[in-house]
């Protein structure tokens, strides 16, 4: 089955069906991983897109996402801080640019950004556009089409907004805003001409079918950058005792996402540390992009280490 699907996807531009994706769950894992590797090679080549983030505003979030350390609903003892200064944001941007990172994103806690805070962020992006050559991304929550247009005018080229999980499982993860609000934000971003980065988190307690449903939702939205985060349970959150996924289940999930979205960059994101060798095998199983450096509330592998790893695998940045 795997070889037949590969031939049709590569040579005929075939989109696999939902039933075919479900059947991949029970296929031999080595065949599925090798198939995803071939799809990455055909559609994305050897290049790996590197992006980095700064936790530009941390904590005191009004939303109740059950995996998140920054929600006001949970006692996680994280250090909160208001919007970082421009000097802090510029320093990290320049460091990342010098180390070879392609994209840099401000990430802010909260449902969304408005008022003076949004104006401050616009000014930050305008200055970054002048002071660096790195591509600029933004992850500011649920915001309006007007705000997205202003971000684009300020120099942002890509907006990040995860769906997190399937529509069917979503209510078990978040109740303070809807799945449709997330989808509308994505549509608004695309509507003003921004590229969109959107994916989710695996290991929340969802089924493999939920992951496939998410992958098809992203396909229908024509997302070309799909970050896959792996839950790292955080003390104080409702998911602090959630079972961790094993290496094989994570890799097979990533590979099936690639079969469903062959032309998209599957981006290895938060939780890489739960994979052997920081996801070395994932880069040979469909992944063609990664967040490098540190994440929002957890540590990463380091930019130099990531580039060294990718070069060892014969990949380029």
From Swiss-Prot:
Reactions catalysed, as given in the entry: (4R,5S)-dethiobiotin + (sulfur carrier)-SH + 2 reduced [2Fe-2S]-[ferredoxin] + 2 S-adenosyl-L-methionine = (sulfur carrier)-H + biotin + 2 5'-deoxyadenosine + 2 L-methionine + 2 oxidized [2Fe-2S]-[ferredoxin]
- Enzyme Commission code(s) on record: 2.8.1.6
Q: Where is the Radical SAM core domain?
A: 43-272
UniProt cofactor(s): [4Fe-4S] cluster; [2Fe-2S] cluster
Pathway the protein acts in? Cofactor biosynthesis; biotin biosynthesis; biotin from 7,8-diaminononanoate: step 2/2
Function recorded in the entry = Catalyzes the conversion of dethiobiotin (DTB) to biotin by the insertion of a sulfur atom into dethiobiotin via a radical-based mechanism.
Q: How does it assemble?
A: Homodimer.
Q: Which family does it belong to?
A: Belongs to the radical SAM superfamily. Biotin synthase family.
**Protein name (database record):** Biotin synthase
